[in-house]
């Protein structure tokens, strides 16, 4: 008896077969019409109206018209009521000429389907009118046990719910995992250290993304406290964003991400754990509370189904299984709930007769609470004389790192996370931040210690002097393989952060971080030059101007 109501944007030919499109290999003949034409203004008005309608209890159920459009949203909701009757003639269209099946399956993110009690319909329609949102009754939920679709007063579609929801047999897939052969640290090839440091900053995955980011508005409603770029020139990277949600409250939210697909070449488990740690690490680096955070997972995978054209499908599926286990284990360790997610399992294309597949990739996006946005911490160094501390042990892994890609040869095992240890460290750091002890904080990710050091110096337009002999290491660092400077500067061991502290706060800082793996590795300087020493001698000195030019990819290095 509930009415099926569609709210939001009108239906068009865009977004037809979008779900099918995302599950097939791309080619030169893939239809552009499968991609939805976004309308963010319509979507925003619809979402605000729905929140108000929810608070007033004007609907009993809601789902989006994403993959599959009305066929999916109303078909899913019909599983609760026991059936649905859909009238395609009532559906508002962008233009005439759509076939009934096109109206039924066109998908969009700015359309939603509601279940509305008839007695509340008038109030819902009036609210939608006042909020300038189109709302239309397009059917009725029934007990027929079927999805009935009508167009031009004629029944054009009829499916039993049992077939719709359970009619497709479950696939029986084979996953085959071959663990990589354990190997000790691989000797680092000789290189021009200074040149390598600049090339790391110019590498496409490390270099500035300002040209892209500035195309988007990150000042909406003046709520952004920490923006994508920070520092005196507003051109150094942040570890994420901090937003003030309500003007009258100091509480805010952080938004961070974690993604490291190259680590997955050897093991999807390690990749997933490192992605979670990177998102959590960025949240904590901004001043976020590690006890208050949530995340969503986005899996982007090459076809994991074995077949004649996909002989390694069983391994790709095993990587997916490993990644799911790594994600689950890391989230449990951090008490991190996954509140949403998405997957795309057919990221393959044929271009000029050649098959191209993406790497197995997991993106973790995190939103958490920062108790006081006034205590938010940014990556840029603040003043000469501030003391530099490196938190977390460096284990010297170079596999899958930016440096390995520049070296052009395998450099051993990739990074692996230890979430339980990291969580203890993050709690201690957060307590120190709440006390106002931390001046700057930057997580170590792509490019390792060197990239973090260079970016923080660039942000403050201040130099730094560090001693690699002081870097906290574990027995796994691989010092016996030589080239220690490269290993310590460029390894991407997770759960590490670069922190600056005022000299007068040193005692408070050490008390707050008692028992944590950390070491004082240097200090901030006024000479706009980053100096690195090892074994009692200077191994590199690079000026801020050179760092800026390299990081902004003026003549940068391709990925």
Regions picked out by a protein language model, each given a short descriptive name:
Residues 2-559:
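Glycine/proline-enriched, intrinsically flexible loops and inter-domain linkers
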């Amino acid at each position: 008896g509930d009415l099926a109501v569609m709210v939001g944007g009108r239906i068009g030919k865009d977004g037809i077969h979008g779900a099918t499109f995302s599950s097939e290999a791309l080619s030169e003949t893939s239809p552009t019409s499968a991609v939805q034409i976004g309308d963010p203004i319509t979507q925003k008005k619809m979402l605000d109206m729905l929140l108000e309608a929810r608070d007033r209890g004007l609907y009993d159920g809601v789902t989006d018209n994403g993959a599959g459009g009305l066929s999916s949203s109303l078909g899913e909701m019909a599983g609760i009521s026991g059936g649905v009757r859909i009238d395609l003639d009532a559906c508002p269209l962008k233009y005439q000429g759509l076939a009934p099946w096109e109206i039924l399956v066109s998908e969009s993110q700015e359309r939603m389907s509601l279940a509305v009690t008839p007695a509340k319909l008038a109030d819902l329609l009036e609210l939608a009118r006042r909020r300038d949102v189109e709302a239309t009754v397009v059917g009725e939920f029934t007990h027929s046990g079927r999805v009935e679709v009508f167009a031009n007063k004629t029944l054009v579609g009829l499916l039993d719910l049992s077939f719709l929801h359970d009619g497709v047999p479950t696939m029986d897939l084979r996953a085959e995992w071959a663990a990589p052969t354990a190997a000790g640290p691989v000797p680092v090839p000789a290189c021009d250290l200074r040149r390598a440091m600049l090339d790391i900053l110019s590498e496409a995955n490390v270099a500035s993304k300002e040209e892209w980011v500035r195309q988007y508005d990150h000042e909406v409603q003046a709520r952004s406290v920490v923006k994508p770029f920070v520092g005196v020139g507003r051109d150094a990277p942040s570890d994420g964003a901090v937003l003030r949600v309500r003007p009258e409250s100091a509480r805010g939210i952080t938004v961070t991400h974690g993604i490291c697909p190259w680590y997955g070449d050897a093991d999807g488990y390690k990749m997933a754990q490192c992605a979670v740690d990177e998102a959590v690490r960025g949240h904590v680096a901004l001043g976020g509370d590690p006890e208050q955070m949530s995340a969503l997972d986005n899996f982007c995978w090459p076809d994991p189904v074995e077949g004649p054209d996909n002989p390694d499908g069983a391994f790709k599926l095993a990587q997916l299984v490993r990644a799911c286990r790594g994600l689950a284990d890391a989230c449990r360790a951090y008490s991190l709930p996954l509140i949403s997610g998405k997957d795309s399992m057919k990221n393959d294309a044929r271009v000029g007769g050649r098959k191209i597949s993406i790497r197995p990739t997991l993106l973790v996006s995190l939103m958490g609470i920062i108790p006081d946005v006034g205590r938010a911490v940014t990556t840029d160094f603040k003043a000469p004389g501030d003391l530099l501390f490196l938190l977390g042990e460096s284990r010297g892994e170079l596999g899958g790192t930016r440096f390995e890609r520049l070296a052009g040869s395998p450099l051993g095992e990739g990074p692996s996370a230890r979430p339980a240890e990291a969580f203890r460290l993050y709690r201690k750091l957060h307590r120190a931040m709440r006390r106002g002890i931390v001046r700057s904080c930057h997580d170590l990710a792509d490019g390792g210690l060197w990239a973090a050091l260079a970016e923080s110096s660039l942000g403050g337009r201040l130099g730094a002097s560090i001693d690699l002999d002081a870097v906290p290491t574990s027995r796994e660092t691989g010092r016996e393989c030589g080239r220690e400077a490269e290993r310590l500067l460029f390894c991407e061991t997770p759960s590490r952060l670069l922190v600056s502290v005022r000299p007068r706060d040193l005692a408070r800082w050490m008390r707050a971080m008692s028992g944590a793996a950390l070491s004082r590795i240097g200090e901030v300087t006024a000479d706009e030059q980053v100096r690195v020493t090892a074994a009692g001698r200077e191994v590199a000195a690079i000026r801020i101007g050179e760092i800026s030019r390299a990081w902004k990819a003026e003549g940068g290095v391709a990925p």
